[in-house]
């Protein structure tokens, strides 16, 4: 059974957290480019404190507020900034408006996967292999519905299913899957329609939007465990 539930309904289930624009896309990109770990942090103040308390870790500070760089941080929330040259071997303290809070809220699940359009096919196939009860947690924008996260949920559902493997889901899951089928092959068009996508374009972040709209460019499986996001071995 796959639901898109309230965050509190996660005990005994496998959760998938999605924030396409841009937190989970950026986390996936950083890990694919060799980052050691990504630690979701709730506030800039907490990030600064953790970095001060652990100077030997040489944390990279990444994140945003209102879609722009936090003063004193090394990187904002653009996946394009998390290059191999910048992140390889580095632990990252990461705080964003929506995504990192959603990841932390999902901690009560038995396992928490981090998904974006980049790795949605890989996550969907992994969930199909596991045959578990899944909760898809869309971060949205300020806890409100978002097109980009919903279409990513639909992509995961589509890749979970097969000719002999129907996926049982709730109504929101059905809507998500139909949205993906409608926009498969032109996901950038949908992200341009979304309110968050339009905001990024207004801020001059068109390249971020196009990057985040790519489907299936990564095969990694990031998981949130013991307070940090790492790649599943």
Swiss-Prot record:
Tell me which Pfam families the record gives: 2-ph_phosp (PF04029)
Q: Which GO terms describe its molecular function?
A: 2-phosphosulfolactate phosphatase activity; magnesium ion binding; sulfopyruvate decarboxylase activity
User: Does the record's keyword annotation contain Acyltransferase?
Assistant: no
Q: What's its catalytic activity?
A: (2R)-O-phospho-3-sulfolactate + H2O = (2R)-3-sulfolactate + phosphate
Cofactor list: Mg(2+)
Q: Which UniProt keywords apply?
A: Hydrolase, Magnesium
Domain of life, per lineage: Bacteria
Keyword Magnesium part of the UniProt annotation:
yes
Q: Could you say which EC number(s) this protein's record lists?
A: 3.1.3.71
Give me the segments passing through the membrane: none
Family membership: Belongs to the ComB family.
Which PANTHER family does the entry link to?
2-PHOSPHOSULFOLACTATE PHOSPHATASE-RELATED (PTHR37311:SF1)
Q: Which HAMAP family match?
A: ComB (MF_00490)
Q: What is this protein called?
A: Probable 2-phosphosulfolactate phosphatase
Please tell me the species this chain comes from.
Answer: Symbiobacterium thermophilum (strain DSM 24528 / JCM 14929 / IAM 14863 / T)
């Amino acid at each position: 059974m796959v639901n898109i539930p309230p965050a509190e309904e996660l005990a005994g289930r496998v959760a998938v957290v999605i924030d396409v624009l841009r937190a989970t896309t950026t986390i996936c990109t950083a890990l694919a480019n060799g980052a050691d770990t990504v630690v979701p942090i709730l506030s800039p103040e907490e990030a600064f404190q953790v970095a001060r308390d652990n100077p030997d870790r040489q944390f990279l500070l990444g994140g945003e507020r209102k879609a722009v760089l936090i003063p004193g941080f090394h990187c904002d929330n653009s996946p394009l900034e998390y290059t191999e040259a910048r992140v390889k071997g580095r632990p990252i303290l990461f705080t964003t408006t929506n995504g990192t809070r959603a990841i932390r809220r999902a901690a009560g699940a038995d396992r928490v996967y981090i998904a974006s359009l980049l790795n949605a096919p890989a996550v969907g196939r992994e969930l199909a292999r596991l045959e578990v009860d899944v909760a898809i947690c869309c971060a949205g924008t300020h806890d409100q519905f978002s097109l980009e996260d919903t279409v990513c949920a639909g992509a995961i559902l589509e890749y979970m299913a097969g000719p002999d493997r129907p996926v049982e889901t709730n109504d929101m899951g059905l809507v998500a899957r139909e949205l993906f089928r409608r926009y498969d092959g032109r996901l950038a068009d949908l992200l341009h329609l979304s309110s968050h996508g339009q905001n990024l374009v207004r801020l001059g972040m068109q390249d971020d939007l196009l990057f985040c709209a790519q489907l299936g460019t990564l095969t990694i499986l990031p998981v949130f465990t013991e307070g940090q996001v790492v790649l599943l071995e």
